[in-house]
């Protein structure tokens, strides 16, 4: 039992690290050639905001301002699934996007993706009185 748990934690640690590296490579560095190694050519996209496939995602990133940045707050893994809670800023929108990205791994690459995106609330908009990301409200 302990051996299985340790093996699972190793796979999950690796998957978390791969998601963070992939998101930095694509969204922050915009290194499309290097980013290809993280996304399957048969990548399945479930997002209502992103065209199908790996090229749909890459073309979307190409279309947004160079100032776009991704930062991660929390990342969890369970087997072949990783959920990343992050923020996309600098997209030329009135508010940053807070995202929960769900990725499924297959053969060491992203095979499938779902997301939930929401405009980041200001302190005045927050019913809970707490920020959606980090410990401070956006300015």
Task: Describe the predicted segments one by one.
Residues 1-139:
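C-terminal and inter-domain tail/linker signature
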């Amino acid at each position: 039992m302990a051996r299985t748990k340790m093996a699972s934690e190793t796979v999950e640690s690796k998957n978390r690290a791969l998601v963070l590296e992939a998101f930095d490579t694509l969204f922050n560095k915009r290194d499309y050639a290097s980013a290809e190694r993280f996304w399957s050519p048969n990548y399945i996209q479930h997002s209502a905001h992103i065209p199908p496939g790996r090229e749909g995602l890459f073309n979307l990133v190409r279309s947004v301002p160079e100032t776009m940045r991704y930062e991660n707050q929390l990342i969890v893994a369970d087997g072949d699934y990783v959920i990343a809670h992050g923020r996309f800023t600098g997209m030329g929108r009135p508010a940053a996007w807070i995202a929960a990205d769900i990725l499924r791994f297959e053969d060491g690459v992203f095979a499938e993706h779902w997301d939930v995106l929401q405009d980041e609330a200001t302190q005045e908009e927050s019913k809970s009185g707490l920020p959606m990301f980090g410990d401070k409200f956006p300015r």
